[in-house]
Swiss-Prot record:
Underlying gene: gsfR2
Industrial or biotech use: Griseofulvin is a spirocyclic fungal natural product used in treatment of fungal dermatophytes.
Protein's name according to its UniProt entry: Transcription factor gsfR2
Record-annotated disulphide pairs: none
InterPro entries in the cross-refs: Zn2-C6_fun-type_DNA-bd_sf (IPR036864), Zn2Cys6_DnaBD (IPR001138)
Function comment: Transcription factor that regulates expression of the gene cluster that mediates the biosynthesis of Griseofulvin, an important antifungal drug that has been in use for a long time for treating dermatophyte infections.
Length: 415
């Protein structure tokens, strides 16, 4: 009679390493992106495809992507080996950003990533796929806007230490290795040139592999898992949309890791409940008795899950012309003053005085009816574009906000 416990996978046995006996792959095999097979005497232990497991257990929300470099192709190629040496973390002083308000408008909307990304990816597809992408101009305009905005996130993070899903005050004092490495990798990537491109890509590859091999999503604390997922999202944005074939192939191979980590974080993250016709914002779940530190963790988690979902959705749409139906049961706090607060005092004041706009995406219209144009920040605008289109969003925001978020071009003549 076979034993009731699961045996270690063959790879871990051969390497004499401890196996966590996970399905469809153990954590070690998943991190190394290799086949994971249990003893064939027990058929029910045999490897299943990672893609099937992820699709059955995880679904995320929607689009993201942007403008990168040229010469991309979509065939997978083996990952370039990286140096076995452990790169030192950046000095803690690297995290000493001033407590200035998060000022997204100060980031120039230049061609940080080359604008040929869409044409480059689309032209690699079969004719039927290309037709599917270009036939729905409404979806195409929304995805392109989200892609162009979200792809500059690594640059924003390197310059300000904060993005629409990473809050500076949550990690600045802790200086976690995952985000510390991501910050240095993003900063180095912003300095990429023809001469140093190989070094920049090797550094990025090393940081990514180091991150994936160091995190067990089942054992990591919620904060460690959050920071690891945030770092991985940054690496994926760069790799998917830079235009380098090797980076893109590796990012596609790492997508199951992203989805697995997101699934684990989802299980630990409370979401807001739908309004149920209640007009008092205090009645929304999670509103009462909240301290700033806890709020930063929970809100960062919700925003990170939405951003990871956008990354998956936009890239799938750009590459394939469609995306699977996303799980819209996500929520976040859309109030810009709350997310951009850099001190507990300013956050508490805004928490009491401002409309908090705790939005469940599936109930967008009920909550957004209470908002003004200047209440929204980048994530809220992106979600609104994905739900309502660039034209409707631009009309709701008004001229000054259109300029602020780069919607003026999309608004005139777009959908």
């Amino acid at each position: 009679m076979p034993p009731l416990y699961r045996r270690s996978c063959i790879t871990c046995v051969q390497s004499k390493r401890k196996c966590d006996q996970g399905l469809p792959k153990c954590q070690r095999c998943l991190a190394k992106n290799i086949h994971c097979e249990y003893n064939p005497r027990y058929p029910n232990r045999r490897r299943q495809t990672t893609e099937r497991n992820v699709d059955e257990n995880v679904s995320l929300v929607e689009p993201i992507a942007e403008e990168p470099s040229r010469g991309c192709q979509l065939q997978r190629s083996p990952a370039r080996p990286t140096s076995p040496t452990h790169s030192p973390h950046a000095n803690d002083i690297f995290f000493n950003f001033a407590n200035d308000p998060f000022n997204l408008e100060s980031i120039p909307q230049d061609n940080f990533l080359n604008s040929t990304i869409f044409e480059d990816v689309v032209t690699q597809q079969a004719p039927n796929d290309t037709e599917r992408i270009t036939s729905d101009t409404t979806a195409q305009a929304r995805v392109e806007f989200a892609a162009k905005k979200l792809s500059v996130i690594p640059k924003i993070f390197s310059q300000q230490g904060q993005t629409m899903f990473i809050h500076r005050q949550l990690f600045q004092d802790r200086a976690p290795p995952a985000l510390q490495d991501a910050l240095s990798a993003c900063a180095l990537y912003c300095l990429k040139s023809t001469e140093n491109q190989t070094l920049v890509f090797r550094n990025l590859e090393h940081k990514r592999k180091q991150l994936i091999s160091s995190i067990d999503p089942l054992l990591a604390s919620k904060l460690d898992l959050l920071e690891a997922l945030q770092a991985l999202v940054l690496y994926q944005i760069i790799s998917l949309f830079d235009g380098d074939i090797r980076l893109r192939a590796q990012a596609e191979a790492d997508e199951p890791v992203l989805l697995m980590w997101a699934a684990q974080l989802t299980l630990r993250t409370p979401q807001f409940q739908p309004p149920l016709g209640l007009s008092n914002p205090q009645s929304l779940a999670g509103s009462a008795s909240m301290d700033w530190g806890r709020w930063l963790i929970e809100e960062s988690s919700r925003r990170t899950l939405i951003t990871a979902s956008m990354l998956k959705g936009v890239y799938s749409f750009v590459k394939l012309g469609y995306d699977t139906v996303p799980d819209m049961r996500m929520s976040f706090t859309a109030q810009a003053v709350l997310w951009n607060s850099q001190s507990e005092i300013s956050w508490r004041r805004a928490y009491k005085e401002k409309e908090r706009l705790e939005i469940q995406v599936t109930h967008w219209d009920e909550t957004i009816a209470k908002a003004k144009a200047n209440d929204l920040e980048e994530l809220g605008v992106l979600i609104m574009v994905m739900l309502k289109g660039t034209g409707a969003t631009g009309e709701w925001l008004g001229h000054s906000q259109n300029i602020r978020y780069g919607l003026e071009e999309a608004y005139y003549g777009s959908v």
